[in-house]
From Swiss-Prot:
It holds the Pfam family HGTP_anticodon. SUPFAM superfamilies: Class II aaRS ABD-related (SSF52954), Class II aaRS and biotin synthetases (SSF55681). PANTHER family: HISTIDINE--TRNA LIGASE, MITOCHONDRIAL-RELATED, HISTIDYL-TRNA SYNTHETASE. GO terms for biological process: histidyl-tRNA aminoacylation. This is Histidine--tRNA ligase.
Amino acid sequence: MKIERLKGFRDHYPDDMEIRYDFIKKMMDTAISFGYKMIDFPSLESMDLYRLKSGTELVEQTFSFTDKGGREVTMIPEATPSTMRMLTSRKDIKMPARWFSIPKVWRYEEPQEGRYREHIQFNADMFGADSPEADAEIIGLAATILDNLGLSGQYEINVNDRYLMELILRDLGSNNPVDLFPVIDRFKKMDLTDFKKRLLKDLDDDASEKLISLLMNRIDINDVERLLNGYANDVMERVKRLKDTFALTSKYTKSKLNIDLSVVRGLSYYTGIVFEAFDISGELRAILGGGRYDNLSNLFINESIPAVGFAIGDAVIELLLKRNNLWNYKDKRKRYYVVNISSSPEAHIEILNKIRGSGNIAISEVNKRRMQTIIKYAESIKCDFLIIIGDRELSSKKMTIKNLRTQEQAEMNIDDFINNINS
């Protein structure tokens, strides 16, 4: 019986995983350089964790079921609720706290380019700081990660402020601006006529036209005040905070920063600043997204903890790296293939241990194949050197070493090799 891989899921073979692990490690190293520390949490959570604040659409996309104890549980569709659950479970965490995580997440969506039902997601969050400095650091970390992956100049970051949008919508006459956020989030995906019909349920015709005009274009931060001139004072106060954040963020990256009032993010827990990054061609879905969610902690404790963060999925990053010819990995370690043809079955093990202990890679021949077959195999798995230990070499404490790149071959004293392996 043939059992096929499930739709929307991926297999990752060794060559692919080497590259994937390399770019994940670069993300980790970048976060650590900013002072962020790694956390982890279960892949399975209570369904209530997502019903409370993530929004109806996300709940409908979960891989959920009733467990043997009668509890409704789900494979985690995102990391933020679990992270906040962890944060609020302890009182000894010093603020501001900087955390990152790299879980697998699951959503029952229709698979398409850059979207799968299971993917690896890098998350970074800062807790206990509500300031333009904190917002800029988070956006700056996201940008630095992309730059360190070799993508500098290949993306731009679109920024908005949910509080700002709420104030604008109230100024335009909406009594329930938060209800319009899911609609605005689909602005670029909807037919304009259908979009306006939906707006007219909350706004009059003139206000709908004004809002569509605001959403149509990405604008420079210096043009925001002119664009929003005449709106309430509260609007202009939020604009000032955005300008302060932009001024700081621009010191982290040379990539283009835009104000895009259509960016509100789909999840209902976002509060202040929100942002997304896209490739400059505009052909791919969002590379990353994030924002501020200062009120999410209230679901767990009677206290608001300022929080801001972002997430990067591995699927879109893979597409972008491939399009820029960056989907490759060169291991800097030397790879040795060690063959023991002596009468002593353990003669090669010390050499294997010494190679591995030096930080390099040692692979042992375990099938006792013909030498020509061994050489072809060693070359196929990208080994740099072949080491042969036979009775003749062993009697004089020597070994034969062959450079598989140049095909040069020589005998070498075993002790000399061990003592100079990294020279």
